């Protein structure tokens, strides 16, 4: 008869959780950032708010975003006028759109990851779905399971309302699932559609400027990864190993990044203090996770950072003395896609591996061995994942 310890050991993988494939997707509607202020103020009949519009133009110009992908087209907004009216009850209309579209966008990203993985979807044992877009029972994880045709026995975990740190949280959960369930293959899907947080300009030129910041930054996208330990090297291609993952709260900072769900949708509040608060607290997190590896030079690692906004990236770079190229992948994703909340950091991970493979830099982490995946969001919550790159043959 087997002992409890023998049973526990047999259930666990031997090696670390590994990223085996990545897929991303966006809505077809691409919006030029320079044209967005005119669109937002016209569609919400706010063109008469000239001073507020100039402030919003300045926000968009300073966002370092070239374009974004948004599900909300002019046609959809015209068919849902309450969404375009400041603080008008519109939650039902927003929810109806989000519930229908989030699983579909997630499916597209998941299919790309499964195709890259080149294995049968029947081998997926776990599903982690993360979104701030909608809430329903059964959830988006259930809908995606049906859309993909996954096994009815797939073990699902649904994560709602995580915000921008959700991608890191989903990876941390997937790491635990893969390493504690021998042979597990975990599909992680993060989907964000800004239908819930789209907001018309306020009636006052000075009120709720922090809400407008979100309108200048947030965008729609879905990302998916497949995670598993002990990859079968003949048929699976490892990209990154997840060596260590942790989450922490910055004390007394819950007001810095937050959002309120109301009858008028999800109202985001992003205070101007966020870049300073984040940059002042990141180094102690780095020391904590990299001390066992003897690493204290932050330019010696590769960076997969959530691109919350240019001011945040600039402050992190300044505080840690990072070389400009260290945050290249994050800045590229911000420029080409905007801030896609939980889905965003996995776009950066994808850009990291694509860029380094194209340049033939030796490893999936810009030729370096060790790296950091870093996410932050409401709480203020910080997710840190230590990555180990894989050699490029």
From Swiss-Prot:
PROSITE patterns: CHALCONE_SYNTH (PS00441)
CDD domains: CHS_like
Catalytic activity entry: (E)-4-coumaroyl-CoA + 3 malonyl-CoA + 3 H(+) = 2',4,4',6'-tetrahydroxychalcone + 3 CO2 + 4 CoA
Catalytic residues (positions): 164
Keywords: Acyltransferase, Flavonoid biosynthesis, Transferase
Record SUPFAM superfamilies: Thiolase-like (SSF53901)
Top-level taxon in the UniProt lineage: Eukaryota
GO MF assignments: naringenin-chalcone synthase activity
The protein's Enzyme Commission number: 2.3.1.74
GO BP, one annotated term: flavonoid biosynthetic process
Stated family: Belongs to the thiolase-like superfamily. Chalcone/stilbene synthases family.
Name recorded for this polypeptide: Chalcone synthase G
Taxonomic source organism: Petunia hybrida
Lineage: Eukaryota, Viridiplantae, Streptophyta, Embryophyta, Tracheophyta
């Amino acid at each position: 008869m087997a002992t409890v310890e023998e049973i526990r050991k047999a259930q666990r993988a031997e090696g670390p959780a590994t990223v085996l494939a990545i897929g991303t997707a966006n809505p077809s509607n691409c919006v030029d950032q320079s044209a967005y202020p005119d669109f937002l103020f016209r569609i919400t009949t706010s063109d008469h708010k000239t001073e507020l519009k100039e402030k919003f133009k300045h926000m968009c110009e300073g966002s370092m975003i070239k374009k974004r992908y948004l599900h909300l087209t002019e046609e959809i907004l015209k068919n849902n006028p309450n969404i375009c009216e400041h603080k008008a009850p519109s939650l039902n209309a927003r929810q109806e759109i989000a519930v229908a579209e989030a699983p579909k966008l997630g499916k597209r990203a998941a299919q790309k990851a499964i195709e890259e993985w080149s294995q049968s979807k029947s081998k997926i044992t776990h599903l982690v779905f993360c979104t701030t877009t909608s809430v329903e029972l059964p959830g988006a994880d259930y809908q995606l399971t049906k859309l993909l045709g996954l096994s009815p026995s797939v073990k699902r975990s649904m994560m709602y309302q995580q915000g921008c740190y959700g991608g890191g949280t989903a990876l941390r959960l997937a790491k635990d699932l893969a390493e504690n369930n021998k042979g597990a293959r975990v599909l992680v899907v993060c989907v964000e559609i800004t239908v819930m947080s789209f907001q018309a300009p306020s009636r006052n030129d000075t009120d709720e400027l922090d809400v407008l910041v979100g309108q200048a930054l947030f965008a729609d996208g879905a990302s998916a990864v497949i995670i598993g330990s002990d990859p079968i090297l003949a048929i699976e291609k490892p990209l990154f190993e997840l060596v260590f993952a942790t989450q922490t709260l910055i004390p007394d900072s819950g007001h810095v990044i937050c959002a309120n769900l109301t009858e008028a949708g999800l109202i985001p509040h992003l205070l101007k203090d966020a870049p300073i608060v984040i940059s002042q607290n990141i180094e102690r997190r780095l020391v904590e996770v990299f001390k066992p590896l003897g690493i204290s030079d932050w330019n010696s690692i590769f960076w997969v950072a959530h691109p919350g906004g240019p001011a945040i990236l600039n402050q992190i770079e300044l505080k840690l003395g990072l070389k400009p190229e260290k945050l290249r992948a994050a800045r590229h994703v911000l420029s080409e896609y905007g801030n896609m909340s939980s889905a965003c950091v996995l776009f950066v991970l994808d850009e990291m591996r694509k860029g380094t493979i194209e340049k033939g830099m030796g490893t999936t982490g810009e030729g370096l061995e060790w790296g950091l995946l870093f996410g932050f969001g409401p709480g203020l919550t910080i997710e840190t994942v230590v990555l180990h790159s894989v050699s490029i043959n």
